[in-house]
């Protein structure tokens, strides 16, 4: 078995170079699970959490943003829409939110954000196939209360959040870096070849 691989990011992760009072979601907004998850997050989580997190802004980015989400913009919710550069946008923001309630397959955007050292709050569905550990590499929330508590944790204890992001980066580099996966593939092929032809 060879996992999905991502390119190594040669990016200096400097403390304090991003908007510390921000959280964000980025993804294709013509994909039904993204629409459902973000709508749920806005209606059930953010509608309560933003009162407890004054000064924190939620940024929603992604192509084909539906009118139902465009209408949600307010002083603590910035509906950005499509952005040119996922990496640059992510590096400018703090906590990544991935509130997936449905869908299958590995979440490439989560792996890419982890490789940037981002702290991510997602659901059990969002982390499927990745193998990251809750509270160490990522924060997993499957209820409204858990999402709110993890948001409050990240903004009240930025050093803890930063540590989770750094652990996420190390985890992805160890398990999903393309050059390491290719090296493992070569090793496996050599082992097969060394056994000779199948009689």
Regions found by a protein language model. Name each.
Residues 124-140:
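Short acidic/histidine- and often glycine-rich active-site loop of Leloir-type glycosyltransferases
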Residues 1, 6-92:
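Conserved catalytic-core segment of nucleotide-activated headgroup transferases in glycan assembly
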Residues 109-112, 119-123:
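Short hydrophobic beta-strand element within catalytic cores of glycosyltransferases
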Residues 178-199:
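C-terminal alpha-helical cap of glycosyltransferases
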Residues 67-69, 86-87, 104-107, 126-131:
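Short glycine/proline-enriched, acidic/aromatic patches that form the donor-sugar handling elements
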Residues 91-105, 116-119:
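Acidic donor-binding loop of glycosyltransferase active sites
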Residues 153, 160-174, 181-187:
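A short, well-ordered alpha-helix in the C-terminal region of glycosyltransferases
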Residues 138-145, 153-158:
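Conserved acidic donor-binding segment of nucleotide-sugar-dependent glycosyltransferases
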